[in-house]
Amino acid sequence: MCSTKVPNERTEKMNSGLISTRHQVDPKKELSRILRTDAAVKGIERKANSEKYLTLWPKAVLEALDEAIKENRWQSALKIFNLLRKQHWYEPRCKTYTKLFKVLGNCKQPDQASLLFEVMLSEGLKPTIDVYTSLISVYGKSELLDKAFSTLEYMKSVSDCKPDVFTFTVLISCCCKLGRFDLVKSIVLEMSYLGVGCSTVTYNTIIDGYGKAGMFEEMESVLADMIEDGDSLPDVCTLNSIIGSYGNGRNMRKMESWYSRFQLMGVQPDITTFNILILSFGKAGMYKKMCSVMDFMEKRFFSLTTVTYNIVIETFGKAGRIEKMDDVFRKMKYQGVKPNSITYCSLVNAYSKAGLVVKIDSVLRQIVNSDVVLDTPFFNCIINAYGQAGDLATMKELYIQMEERKCKPDKITFATMIKTYTAHGIFDAVQELEKQMISSGENLDIL
């Protein structure tokens, strides 16, 4: 930690604790859940580096693996998988490999995926369509489209592993995210040649890709093809992609027009639709329309969710309309909708921008009395707020509590604190943070 002494500007607050670090146990949690998390899962991870444990309880190992995959901890997942392979009861399964490829794709680890594929073959398993599709996804998400396409070509040569509509859709999704719409067109042509029709998900993927790229003519052209197809009709996801695209492009007229046209097609909106409308009107500064959507939702018995309230709170906060933001936050709590870390981030950012440090203090007090799960972005937000306010003591205390809350500081955390300490001429604190930054694996070049 930084050894530098800083002015203790909020002694009372520091003594009482900024954020309660007591472990708050929910009495409704099942004992089995606690045991699984605290004993089985963590225990398996500790044993993953050892050669001794060859007769572990199957349920514990498999749940530990699922937990690591779910949380995208690819290194832990591979260690646990290696431990799994050593168990006397282990049987190789394609489904397990497919799950591992998924996490490796999410974490952009193509080399690890290639090695894992070799391990799979060495165990005598015959890859399935799902395995190849997952491998294509890994390469695509890692921006290795050549490898993704070569895997697709290999699939075509395997008699019982011909690529299906899901395989093509996964590849299309990767190309859309990389802006390779030339390849998207060639994939669709190839699908037609092979007699593989586009599904609703395929069309939606292309529509969403064009929309996010601001290619509205192409987006509407694909929608026309979808309607003409007749077998894969537009659904609420299509609606959300279309209006979301025009909303992001600040084309409110088109957004509202397509909303009405989809209703005439019999496609009914869902909560995501309304959230998109609220967000779009908010970004455009059309606050009356934003509020009218919320009123419409309540009249139609759509429950306003945490996401809905977060959008409105952030919108009013960014606009500097603090009173309106506070009104919405009060309504949120009155309606029994639970705030999350994103809610509190928006509040802190707005108060910080308005110079209302006292209000930020009140946010901290509310968090102490709640069971909200805090994350690194929240700590970055509130550390920045107190840093800008010149309250270095509180900033430092919050940094300490990050570790107590198991929130790992990232490059934003370090950059924010280093900038603040530099501005105040506290250079020994800067040096200490730079050391911690290096030891944590962060790059000093970002500073």
From Swiss-Prot:
List, in alphabetical order, the Gene Ontology terms for molecular function in this entry: mRNA binding
Question: What residue spans do the PPR repeats cover?
Answer: 93-127, 128-158, 164-198, 199-233, 235-269, 270-304, 305-339, 340-374, 375-409, 410-444
InterPro entries in UniProt: Pentatricopeptide_rpt, PPR5-like, TPR-like_helical_dom_sf
Q: Which UniProt keywords apply?
A: Repeat
Query: Is-annotated flag, keyword Repeat?
Result: yes
What the entry lists under NCBIfam families is as follows: PPR
What PANTHER family does this protein's entry cite? EXPRESSED PROTEIN, PENTATRICOPEPTIDE REPEAT-CONTAINING PROTEIN
Tell me the protein's name.
Answer: Pentatricopeptide repeat-containing protein At3g53170
Q: Which organism is it from?
A: Arabidopsis thaliana
